UniProtKB/Swiss-Prot annotation:
HAMAP family attached to this UniProt entry: UPF0745
Origin species: Alcanivorax borkumensis (strain ATCC 700651 / DSM 11573 / NCIMB 13689 / SK2)
PANTHER family assigned to the protein according to its UniProt record, in alphabetical order: PROTEIN YCGL
Protein name: YcgL domain-containing protein ABO_1767
Entry-linked InterPro entries: YcgL-like_sf (IPR038068), YcgL_dom (IPR027354)
Length: 105
């Protein structure tokens, strides 16, 4: 892609972790995963390619601020999207194995 077409945009690749559901790595498409620190890759596990896309500041992402994603990729070579926090209503529901136990009842 020519530089004129991508002015102010960023062509990226997105990878998901097989180890941690909901964890994704965004990287510059041309550089791939080579700028991601080894220690992070060790914790991320096998990186499965999901898609390639052009990040554009005027086009929002579902779970991350697109401008922050672009800035992190340009500064450090990657952006790590963490899994969303557990749904508090689901977490507190009766029968959830991790629901805190009340001892005053």
């Amino acid at each position: 892609m020519s530089e004129g077409v991508l002015k102010g945009k960023l062509f990226c690749s997105i990878y998901k972790s097989r180890r941690k559901s909901g964890m994704y790595l965004y990287v510059d498409r041309q550089k791939g995963l080579k700028e991601v620190p080894e220690i992070l890759m060790g914790q991320f596990g096998h990186a499965e390619h999901v898609t390639d896309m052009i990040l554009n500041p005027t086009r929002p992402l579902a779970r991350a601020d697109v401008e922050q994603v672009m800035e992190k990729i340009r500064e450090q070579g990657f952006y790590l999207q963490m899994p969303p926090p557990p749904d508090e209503d689901l977490f507190m529901a009766d029968g959830h194995p991790d629901k805190p136990v009340r001892h005053d009842a």
